[in-house]
Swiss-Prot record:
Record flagged with keyword Transferase: yes
Taxonomy, superkingdom: Viruses
Stated family: Belongs to the DNA polymerase type-B family.
Pfam families named among the record's database cross-references: DNA_pol_B_2 (PF03175)
Name of the protein in its database record: DNA polymerase
Keyword Nuclease carried by entry: yes
Regions that span the bilayer: none
Function: Replicates the viral genomic DNA. This polymerase possesses two enzymatic activities: DNA synthesis (polymerase) and an exonucleolytic activity that degrades single-stranded DNA in the 3'- to 5'-direction for proofreading purpose.
Catalyzed reactions per annotation: DNA(n) + a 2'-deoxyribonucleoside 5'-triphosphate = DNA(n+1) + diphosphate
Annotated InterPro entries: DNA-dir_DNA_pol_B, DNA-dir_DNA_pol_B_CS, DNA-dir_DNA_pol_B_mt/vir, DNA-dir_DNA_polB_phi29_vir, DNA/RNA_pol_sf, DNA_pol_palm_dom_sf, RNaseH-like_sf, RNaseH_sf
EC number: 2.7.7.7, 3.1.11.-
Length: 568
């Protein structure tokens, strides 16, 4: 039997050594009983208090598996792991080579305790969580103290109580109301898909077999996201015109519902197949030298770091030219269609994979959770439906090589990491993930191109266009796969991918400045104006983190709007 808890730490901001100065934990089922929450003023006292609570629960109920969630285990977990290593406390943990923290586990004689990351299930802020689950409390302002205080103020206890209560409510919704069994949203979605798929008397591996390592690697050389495409013509200009913003309704679920997707073991060809079948899908390895046609949007992202460096771009950028270099590209038939339309290119076909397709693979799953989302009787049911709809496709492309981080303390007692040996993980079926994103990208770029004269910016699932009565878009406020009008701006400025500002019209007719910038804190965004939003501008207040003695220090540094070499 499993019993769930929620926890939180407040830590000092001393640049030499950090420590937990306030902690709180609570049983998830008691999320609304703040008088039962346990508060402590050191990490050691937190662990002692938690152990006593677990031991009492085990004695009373027989529950022998305890899981406590922290909302960002990478931060809070660094204090735990540092403490365990410093005190020779045996634990197991899983941190991958990308620095993503999943769990820390302690084994006791009668029960186990695992610290887990709630962000893997509820991937949004505590403040957002309070609104989603309609809680009568709101997240406050984090108290930042350089040193551990001698006296704990009541408002600080109130603050941490609220944080833990909101997190506990979110976990209660997922694990008690909606019966989650996994600890990442993607794993939960795949488990549920397999359950529904079995109902149709079909075997998962008959359609999604384990691919040969070379074939799987070929597919993964293609995988890129839907991407963000900024304007070519209006970059850096302040635009004083009406701008409309459109979002695709449930883009990835709609793509899975409305399109055939690959199945089975693909055929492999040298070069290009003599016959291209309309009901089959293809991944092409080509070598190409290319330049963007006049009046067309770029569609190519350079995935290989070496190739990207050769032509002076980042791997996330769309590019306009190969600069007379011959570049290796891995393109689906959807990507190739755009490439040939948008670029003047010299191409040599090196190798091709050909897939059979099936058109109803995900219909039962998507329609089930579409209905649940549209007819949800509770915030928990609606949130689970959204998670199920949006988390499945990516799991098909999950990494097959797992590299764990090994933690150790350096000679100053600071937590450090090194990579462990590689481990192979059984793949799901990468072609599904790559074709879902490829089809979605084809849809977005094609719609952007059809509205070329009005185009300003394409985000993962949205278009930003000059207001016009002649836009070519299939618009519906709710229908899957169609464009919903999400907002209107009276003024805007687009610098590059993930970096733009728009003065949006609110429901009451007033306007507010919406600032998008990866790495910008809310405090930095408040300083942004149309005048100072320029390449090269710097702003104080960017948050960064580093390991120091005791755990993770969050500190402020300078945010700079950087120029890039890329040509979009």
């Amino acid at each position: 039997m499993t019993c769930y808890y929620a926890g939180d730490f407040e830590t000092t901001t001393n640049e030499e050594e950090t420590e937990v100065w306030l902690s709180c934990f609570a049983k998830v089922i008691d999320y609304d009983k703040l008088d039962t929450f346990k508060v402590n003023t050191s990490l050691e006292d937190f662990l002692k208090s938690l152990y006593l609570d677990l031991d009492k629960t085990y004695t009373e109920t027989g529950e022998d598996e305890f899981i406590i969630f922290f909302h960002n285990l990478k931060f809070d977990g660094s204090f735990l792991l540092s403490f365990f290593l410093n005190n020779d406390i045996e634990c197991t943990y899983f941190i991958n080579d990308m620095g993503v923290w999943y769990s820390i586990t302690l084994e006791f004689p009668d029960f186990t305790l695992t610290f887990r990351d709630s962000l893997k299930i509820l991937n949004f802020s505590i403040a957002t969580m309070a609104g989603l689950f309609k809680m009568p409390i709101a997240k406050g302002t984090t108290p930042l103290l350089k040193h551990k205080p001698e006296v704990i103020k009541p408002e600080w206890i109130d603050y941490i109580h609220v944080d833990v209560a909101i997190l506990a409510r979110g976990i209660f919704a997922m694990y008690y109301e909606e019966n989650f069994t996994k600890y990442t949203s993607a794993s939960e979605a795949l488990t549920e898909f397999k359950r529904i798929f079995r109902k149709s008397k079909r075997k998962f591996r008959d359609f999604f077999p384990i691919l040969d390592e070379k074939v799987d690697d070929f597919c993964r050389k293609h995988i890129v996201g839907a991407g963000r495409l900024p304007t070519l013509k209006h970059r850096g200009r302040t635009l004083n015109q009406l701008i409309d913003i459109y979002d695709i309704n449930s883009m990835y679920p709609a793509t899975m519902l409305q399109n055939a997707l690959p199945i089975g073991i693909p055929k492999r060809y040298k070069g290009k197949p003599k016959e291209i079948k309309e009901d089959h899908y293809y991944i092409y390895h080509i070598k190409a030298d290319f330049d963007l046609k006049r009046g067309y949007l770029p569609t190519i992202q350079i995935k290989k770091k070496l190739d990207a460096l050769r032509i002076g771009v980042r791997t996330s950028d769309y590019v306009t030219t190969s600069k007379n270099e011959v570049i290796d590209l891995y393109l689906t038939n959807f990507d190739l269609d755009l490439f040939l339309k948008h670029y003047d290119a010299t191409i040599m076909y090196v190798e091709t994979l050909e897939f059979q397709t099936e058109s109803d693979l995900f219909d039962d799953y998507i329609t089930t959770y579409r209905y649940k989302k549209e007819n949800a009787q509770s915030p928990a049911e609606k949130q689970k439906a959204k998670i199920m709809l949006n988390s499945l496709y990516g799991k098909f492309g999950a990494k097959i090589i797992s590299v764990k981080k090994l933690a150790y303390l350096d000679d100053k007692g600071i937590l450090r990491f090194k990579n462990d040996d590689e481990e192979e993980v059984q793949p799901v079926y990468a072609p599904v993930a790559l074709f879902v994103t490829s089809i979605a990208r084809h849809f977005i770029i094609s719609n952007a191109q059809e509205n070329y004269d009005n185009f300003l910016y394409a985000d993962t699932d949205s278009l930003h266009l000059f207001h016009s009565d002649s836009l070519v878009l299939d618009i519906d406020p709710s229908e899957f796969g169609k464009w919903a009008h999400e907002g209107r701006a009276v003024k805007a400025k687009y610098l590059r991918s993930k970096l733009y500002i728009e003065e949006l019209i609110q429901e009451d007719g007033t306007t507010h400045l919406d600032v998008k910038g990866a790495g910008m804190t809310p405090e930095i965004k408040e300083k942004i104006t149309f005048e100072n939003f320029v390449i090269g501008a710097t702003f104080e207040g960017k948050r960064a983190s580093k390991q120091i003695k005791g755990g993770t220090l969050i500190y402020e540094t300078t945010f700079k709007i950087r120029e890039t070499d890329y040509l979009v």
